[in-house]
Amino acid sequence: MTGAFRSSGKAARFADLVESVQHCDLCPRLCARRKVLSGANGNVESKVLFVAEAPGRLGADRTGVPLYGDRTGDNFEALLGNVNWHREQVFVTNAILCNPQDDHGNNRTPTSEEIANCSAYLEMVINLVEPAIVVTLGATALSAVAHIWPHGLELREDAAKVIPWGTAKLMPLYHPGPRATIHRSLIKQRSDFTRLAQLVHPASGLLQRKPKPAVTLPPIHAIPGGASVAEEPR
């Protein structure tokens, strides 16, 4: 995976945004946690931007890489691979950039206040990347982007529907976490990703070809905590 940029101007703006995020203290319960925004999020020149819910305790909060290092990440990697995509071709972020935990240290759903607090950062990320299509993963992410531009979509009724949204298109999909696969199986999610891939077929020029990596993800075994782990369901 790479955080390489083609535009030095965009690279500088992204670096400034990452620096700003690291100093955020808007959410008292989260401000001490890792802020998951860096070159490891993907390619800021991509035309495809995924928005998930939040860094998982055993995934991005541990690895620093969105949707990576736990069962949710494994599912996401498989969905990308099913359409012959690579992380180097897309950008991945979350509705909130810190891992929300309950009093027992387990993942919890972000509060509406936390989502609102982080919406400005989400908007800045989207504006910087300038994707042709924003793909939300799960109901929380779909709700979060409505803070930026209203859309009127509901995940259960509108999954895989594509609508104009701001200067981009919006496509709501289910989250690849273990719990979400109860409501929409991985088989169905593979079909959703196939539809997405058809929308951004290389011939359309929307999705970049895989560039030469400048930054490589560490092997899972090199990350504190060991091998890919089974995250508690979201």
Where in the sequence are the language-model features?
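Intrinsic disorder/low-complexity segments enriched in polar/small residues
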Residues: S20-H23, R209-P213, E232-P233
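Long, low-complexity, intrinsically disordered segments
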Residues: I220-R234
